[in-house]
UniProtKB/Swiss-Prot annotation:
Organism the protein comes from: Bacteroides fragilis (strain ATCC 25285 / DSM 2151 / CCUG 4856 / JCM 11019 / LMG 10263 / NCTC 9343 / Onslow / VPI 2553 / EN-2)
Primary gene name: dapL
Function according to Swiss-Prot or TrEMBL: Involved in the synthesis of meso-diaminopimelate (m-DAP or DL-DAP), required for both lysine and peptidoglycan biosynthesis. Catalyzes the direct conversion of tetrahydrodipicolinate to LL-diaminopimelate. Can also use m-DAP instead of LL-DAP as the amino-group donor.
UniProt protein name: LL-diaminopimelate aminotransferase
Keywords in alphabetical order: Aminotransferase, Pyridoxal phosphate, Transferase
EC identifiers of the protein: 2.6.1.83
Record's catalysed reaction(s): (2S,6S)-2,6-diaminopimelate + 2-oxoglutarate = (S)-2,3,4,5-tetrahydrodipicolinate + L-glutamate + H2O + H(+)
Amino acid sequence: MALVNEHFLKLPGSYLFSDIAKKVNTFKITHPKRDIIRLGIGDVTRPLPKACIEAMHKAVEEMTSAETFRGYGPEQGYDFLIEAIIKNDYAPRGIHLSPTEVFVNDGAKSDTGNIGDILRHDNSVGVTDPIYPVYIDSNVMCGRAGVLDTESGKWSNVTYMPCTAENHFIPAIPEKRIDIVYLCYPNNPTGTTLTKAELKKWVDYALANDTLILFDAAYEAYIREPDIPHSIYEIKGAKKCAIEFRSFSKTAGFTGVRCGYTVVPKELTAATLEGERIPLNRLWNRRQCTKFNGTSYITQRAAEAIYTPEGKEQIQETINYYMTNARIMKEGLESTGLKVYGGVNAPYLWVKTPKGTSSWRFFDQMLYEANVVGTPGVGFGPSGEGYIRLTAFGERDDCIEAMRRIKNRL
């Protein structure tokens, strides 16, 4: 008989955002006339940039002619997009990449979840806490996370590095050696960042301990302050210890279109049990050729348009719109006496719940009293207890109204 992967049975009954959806749906059934403002899940609301739409229309037209029709594309991505990525996202920062080091995908979530395919199941894992749930869940699925302690909410083979107000949301460098470390900056969910000096400490640690850093830079386009690195490869030596994930979802509104990319440097290696060094670029390329058929041509043409002068201008307008939302929300929440972190270099606000209220309790208060949906911080890890995450991706009027409700009703 067929046997299941029993590691899946270790996962909590449902995904965080599924639990939120169930609570919201229950509220809607019992309060059908209430107008709910959703500031929880980080989905965007602004339309795609005009440059991307025009590029997609043109690509669709190409599909109508035998001379310009495109079928299967390269699993790694089309050269035209990869070259645009390198020219615009890396070369201006003094980072040299080969086209074969960039892998176009259908969004950063896929690759951050799948990168473990090329890594042994018994590697030790380190995560900042709180953390994007996909990092933990994907390691549980392959057996790498160990056993869940239901009381603490922690997995036995995962080292948790608390990010709290007390340490300014800067994770301490581990005292012990860890095989794989996940870093996400600008951070989801806290909206905080690391300076170059702080990120350099992690690169130095990784080089000294033969640690692999999985660096999620999905929100780098929102960085405003000058000393915040946009790429881990701005740090000397990072190509020898880090894989970087990028996404067009929040940069250009591609949450429904689906496109991003992963950088796996050729000089990055990991070891076999016998000590042989294996290039991870080679393994990831092999994995993609087997399990991924590439991102669609139409989508990649849309992504290429992001890097045109018109595309850059339109994208910046959208990013400015969301960051203005973040400022309005941050100021509104602080005016009520709430302590708010993030919202400066990222579209997320990490809000301390009042009077020691638990994350889920404050979620319920916001939903039932203000009819505003956030995300309970504890859903991102044990150190998220006592916080709630709000996103700035809503419509301007909704953000303003949500702040009014929170101020007047809570």
